């Protein structure tokens, strides 16, 4: 694992099954960067939609139009959804789950993912952030399920940030019962691509029962 400029603020231990903090303000590199704060879909002229089915979800995250998306229920994907730029993706209540396939943020900018449970994503990451800028991952729960019986290679990372991604904040998330957690930069062969990027802030996240310490905070 190769880390670039990585800012660890505070790793607060929460007693409940999800981060118990009341802080919802954006801090760190997702806010303080040369481009401007991560706002997601909260922009002038944006639209707001509520989705409860996979087709509605996929339609809402497509494209680059500023959109605030409220997601209700469980979304079991058979292929990885790719979130477009200028999106706020917000789970409603405690029952918003992503299963089957995880989320991809690729070649995008200005994306917020908040208040989801992301569970049992086989052979890939819960969230992959690749070559993307200004992303805020906030108040989510990540778990593999069937831990540790499934072994270390059934699942990949819970939230991986790679390939020159920049100006990222990961806050108030609960990572648990999983072999691999969260990495920043995934291969030395991408050193030239990553150089000068990978500004990432982690704060107030809780890691519990994670099976591989080299992908977890030290």
Kindly give the residue locations of the regions a language model identified.
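Fungal secretory targeting signals
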Residues: 1-19
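Short N-terminal segments immediately surrounding and downstream of signal-peptide cleavage
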Residues: 20-31
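Acidic Gly/Asp/Thr-rich repetitive segments characteristic of extracellular carbohydrate-active
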Residues: 29-69
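Short, solvent-exposed beta-strand edge segments and adjacent coil->beta transition regions
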Residues: 46-48, 124, 156, 212
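Extracellular beta-strand-rich solenoid/capping regions of secreted or surface-exposed proteins
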Residues: 58-66, 72-90, 96-115, 119-133, ...
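Right-handed parallel beta-helix
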Residues: 86, 91-92, 109-120, 133-147, ...
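Functionally important transmembrane alpha-helices
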Residues: 216-218
